[in-house]
Amino acid sequence: MPKRRRGEKKTTYFDYNLLFIIIFLLCFGLVMLYSSSSYTSANKYGDSAHYLKLQARNIAIGLVFMFYFAKKDYHVWRKFGRLAYWGALGFCLVVLAKVPGLTRSSHGQSRWIQVGPIGFQPSELAKIAIIIYLAMLIERIPKQLDKVSSMAKVGIRLVPLVLFVAVNNLSTAIIILGIAVCMLFVASPKYKEFFVVAVLGVLFIFAFINIASYRSDRVEAWKHPETAGDKGYQTMQALYAIGSGKLFGKGLGQSLQKLGNVPEAQNDMIFSIICEELGLFGAVCVILLFVLMLWRMMVIANNAKDLYGALLVTGIMSHIAIQVVLNIAVVTNTIPNTGVILPFIS
């Protein structure tokens, strides 16, 4: 929000179209979360609405913060760029060190920091931190980004955080790299340099896949899920769910695959249940909602008062877009399993 002169009437700009899309996706997400998780939740916790209640609580907290920060001048985040970056880096180090009493494991990986009832993944914090930090850096040297050396200096500053995240969570590291590339491209759209960056990014991903054997196993399971045993089971069941939904689906709440067949149906595989219950028609509608959301964000970025505001929106837009594409690509077995959730719905 720009500063106003003395005597000027304060004006705020609020995109109600974007707000409506967000609220609709959140409400739709609650419905689908309950539908996909009620069976598992009842068996595990004795309460079919356990996951629904947790999600509703988190949404309520998120909406409070959203409306609070929507009234604030976004330039205030510029002051926290370095703090956000170094804070995220520090939390990632805590997870890597597996500090007793501060970290907990999930699905065999130590990715969480747990302090009493409060738990979070530093890798998720790193996504937001990189947006705030990179927007601050780029705004200070926009014209210098035409030089390859200046772009390389910015990229080098991101390397420690990306590497620390990639050790335990390669998919999130890929998302962070994608966000950074999109923000740099908006600031300096030089195609040759970004082709080089893309090649280096592919080499980075290839190297990390081969470092850990379980990542190589995921690639093999992706190529031949039908013969991969337990490693390909989730993918095969998700594909069965998608195929059985046909054009208009079996009907809301009528999924059979959610009855213990699709592991983590309420998490990264929820799109397969959407396809089964609402069919291809429902899946396309969900994708169109995300497209509309990204379009509204692009409009906001184009009309931002300054480069910093445009970069913040670009970073958030890139984050959501990359995560949606990765999630749907995993569910449809277009790429190996990454564990990336579907924003606003999972």
List where the protein language model places each region.
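N-terminal membrane topogenic signal
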Residues: 7-22
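N-terminal Lys/Arg-rich, disordered targeting/topogenic segments
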Residues: 1-6
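Hydrophobic alpha-helical transmembrane segments of multi-pass inner membrane proteins, especially
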Residues: 23-27, 35, 45-234, 272-333
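Short linear Ser/Thr-Pro motifs
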Residues: 35-38, 255, 346
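Alpha-helical transmembrane segments of multi-pass integral membrane proteins
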Residues: 27-29, 243-244
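Extracellular/periplasmic helix-loop-helix junctions in multi-pass membrane proteins
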Residues: 331-345
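TM-adjacent membrane-interface loops and short helices in multi-pass inner/ER membrane proteins
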Residues: 221, 225-267, 271, 278-282
